[in-house]
């Protein structure tokens, strides 16, 4: 039995890649392609079961509210989710307990693994910094992936009793040392020619470790998205991150 899939942000670069991947999958049927200016009611009219959202932080909450209220599962790659937004989504889902929502900062399998590797390495090194690099049209900084990575690193270091990275900086230009995410410095680069890239730099006495992931094409997101589409109907409520779907 095929799953009826809709895509929000269908005319965007990622959206186009996801539409192509859904069309190529034997067990999925692309029934709705919706973008800016199109009616969300298209999903109810076409009997869409799962919607993939790659839109913009400014509109994603309205999209999700509509989908949850209509019992449509959602797989969300749009970034900009903080704790308050996630709690709001949980509130909507409480009134629609059979509906599932997956929100992931990154759907590239390698990126998900790199976040897990960084979490595992965090307690063994004195210093750590995160550098994320993206195309110049990205709306948010730091990226959702970098924000999530820094949070996982900070939690792992706190559990292990590891203190903040040493830093004797006493004067700096505003922003020169990057953003502080739970005690982990995060730096954002925006450069034409890039897609999505991240480095986590660890250092301690006598050695360094670099964990790097590169998405060189937006098709790298498709396997993770399709996994989410296939599984979200079995997981009511809110899932944050692709990790549970990969048994990590």
Swiss-Prot record:
User: What are the binding positions for NAD(+) in this chain?
Assistant: 9-14, 77-79, 104-107
Cite the Pfam families for this sequence: DapB_C, DapB_N
- Supply one GO molecular-function term: NADP binding
Q: Which domain of life is it from?
A: Bacteria
The record, for PROSITE patterns, names: DAPB (PS01298)
Q: Which SUPFAM superfamilies match?
A: Glyceraldehyde-3-phosphate dehydrogenase-like, C-terminal domain, NAD(P)-binding Rossmann-fold domains
Q: Where does (S)-2,3,4,5-tetrahydrodipicolinate bind?
A: 135, 144-145
Q: Kindly give the InterPro entries that the UniProt entry links to this protein.
A: DapB_C, DapB_N, DapB_N_CS, DHDPR_bac, NAD(P)-bd_dom_sf
Where does this protein reside within or beyond the cell?
A: Cytoplasm
Active site, per annotation: 134, 138
Q: What is its main location?
A: cytoplasm
- Coiled-coil spans in chain: none
Q: What's the catalysed reaction?
A: (S)-2,3,4,5-tetrahydrodipicolinate + NAD(+) + H2O = (2S,4S)-4-hydroxy-2,3,4,5-tetrahydrodipicolinate + NADH + H(+); (S)-2,3,4,5-tetrahydrodipicolinate + NADP(+) + H2O = (2S,4S)-4-hydroxy-2,3,4,5-tetrahydrodipicolinate + NADPH + H(+)
Q: Look up the record and report any one GO term of the cellular component aspect.
A: cytosol
Give its E.C. classification number. 1.17.1.8
One of the protein's GO biological processes: lysine biosynthetic process via diaminopimelate
Pathway connected to this protein: Amino-acid biosynthesis; L-lysine biosynthesis via DAP pathway; (S)-tetrahydrodipicolinate from L-aspartate: step 4/4
Tell me the NCBIfam families matching this sequence: dapB (TIGR00036)
Q: Which family does it belong to?
A: Belongs to the DapB family.
Q: Which HAMAP family match?
A: DapB
Q: What does this protein do?
A: Catalyzes the conversion of 4-hydroxy-tetrahydrodipicolinate (HTPA) to tetrahydrodipicolinate.
> What name is this protein filed under?
4-hydroxy-tetrahydrodipicolinate reductase
Gene name of the record: dapB
């Amino acid at each position: 039995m095929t799953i009826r899939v809709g895509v929000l942000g269908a005319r965007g670069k990622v959206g186009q890649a996801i539409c192509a991947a859904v069309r190529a999958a034997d067990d999925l049927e692309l029934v709705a392609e919706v973008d800016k200016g199109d009616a969300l009611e298209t999903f109810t009219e076409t009997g869409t079961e799962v919607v993939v959202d790659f839109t913009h932080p400014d509109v994603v909450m309205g999209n999700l509210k509509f989908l949850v209220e209509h019992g449509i599962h959602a797989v969300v790659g749009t970034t900009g989710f903080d704790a308050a937004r996630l709690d709001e989504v949980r509130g909507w889902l409480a009134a629609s307990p059979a509906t599932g929502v997956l929100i992931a900062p990154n759907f590239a399998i390698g990126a998900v693994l790199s976040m897990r590797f960084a979490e595992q390495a965090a307690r063994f090194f004195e210093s750590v910094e995160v550098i994320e690099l993206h195309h110049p049209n990205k709306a948010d900084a730091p990226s959702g992936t970098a924000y999530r990575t820094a949070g996982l690193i900070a939690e792992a270091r706190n559990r292990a009793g590891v203190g903040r990275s040493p830093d004797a900086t006493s004067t700096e230009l505003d922003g020169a040392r990057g953003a502080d995410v739970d005690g982990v410095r995060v730096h954002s680069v925006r450069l034409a020619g890039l897609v999505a890239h991240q480095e986590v730099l660890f250092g301690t006495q006598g050695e360094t470790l670099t964990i790097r992931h590169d998405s060189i094409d937006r098709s790298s997101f498709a396997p993770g998205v399709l996994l989410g589409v296939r599984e979200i109907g079995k997981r009511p409520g809110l899932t944050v991150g692709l990790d549970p779907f990969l048994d990590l």
